Amino acid sequence: MANLKALKVRIGSVKNTRQITKAMKMVAAAKLRKATEQAESARPYSKRMSRMMHSLAPAAAGRDNAPELLVGRGDVKKVNLVVYTADRGLCGSFNSVVIRATRARIAELEKQGFQVMLTFIGRKAYDVLKRSHGHLVRKVYTEMSRHMSFAYVEKNIVKELIKDFHEGQFDACYLVFNQFKSAMSQELTWAQSIPQPIDTEGASTQTGYQFEPVEEELLEELLPRNLAVQVFQALAESEASEHGSRMTAMDNAVRNAGDMVKKLQTKYNRSRQAAITTELIEIISGAESLKG
């Protein structure tokens, strides 16, 4: 009977877990719809900005007064990695994929003689990497789901990046994030953001155009905005990927809990039947002994 009671308690516990994971799946699905809309609506603007930069940048890059955000400062010695993860777990391999890739890139860069610093957008990667790479941490931004606006990103993250770059704290900057493909598919992505990559083929797209003011002046205004677009787009992609991963993980958890309940229920029924059979045998045996 003690075994039956333990099984009954365990069945109840698994059922409760299933209800919790089912609720978490529904919440993640609702957040995913919103995050997907935001990521997809930001893509056309990002592509249009990229095309504009490719029209302006090639000609300006070869001039002496080219903006540093475009051409850099010469030799790259210090590299800043901007790492996007979630603030919370229970989202499958979403966080671990980025963390593993970041750890590998740090080792690779340090082996090549670069000085590395880390900027975290989301707490999970910071919580893991601070144990081994705490001395590399530059800044940590958390609770970004509450601040999913272009204006916030531009004011609080991008301005700091540009300021630190101009002060010489780093020479190059790369973003690492999960690009959203679908609820069940995300692609780890590395993107150079500072100096902003120049498409040399883009030089042909500007033929026949005259810019007023000149390219350098336009770029001084457009480069910070383009950087903000890159950082925000990566955040939007990461946010959608997080909710997609969490919804998928919770869906798997619900299914697994359901399977476990069925197995435990079968085991409970068999144990109960065995206990009843044993009691009947004892009763019959006792009655027979009394007759004797």
Swiss-Prot record:
Q: How does it sit in the membrane?
A: Peripheral membrane protein
The entry's localization annotation reads: Cell inner membrane
Family, similarity comment: Belongs to the ATPase gamma chain family.
**Per its UniProt record, what PROSITE patterns does this chain match?**
ATPASE_GAMMA
An example Gene Ontology CC term for this record: proton-transporting ATP synthase complex
Q: Write one Gene Ontology MF term.
A: proton-transporting ATP synthase activity, rotational mechanism
Q: What's a BP term from Gene Ontology annotated to this protein? A: proton motive force-driven plasma membrane ATP synthesis
Task: Specify whether Isomerase is a keyword of the entry.
Answer: no
Q: Which UniProt keywords apply?
A: ATP synthesis, Cell inner membrane, Cell membrane, CF(1), Hydrogen ion transport, Ion transport, Membrane, Transport
Q: Which Pfam families match?
A: ATP-synt
Self-association state and partner proteins as the record states: F-type ATPases have 2 components, CF(1) - the catalytic core - and CF(0) - the membrane proton channel. CF(1) has five subunits: alpha(3), beta(3), gamma(1), delta(1), epsilon(1). CF(0) has three main subunits: a, b and c.
Name of protein: ATP synthase gamma chain
Q: Which organism is it from?
A: Magnetococcus marinus (strain ATCC BAA-1437 / JCM 17883 / MC-1)
Q: Which InterPro entries match?
A: ATP_synth_F1_ATPase_gsu (IPR035968), ATP_synth_F1_gsu (IPR000131), ATP_synth_F1_gsu_CS (IPR023632)
Role played: Produces ATP from ADP in the presence of a proton gradient across the membrane. The gamma chain is believed to be important in regulating ATPase activity and the flow of protons through the CF(0) complex.
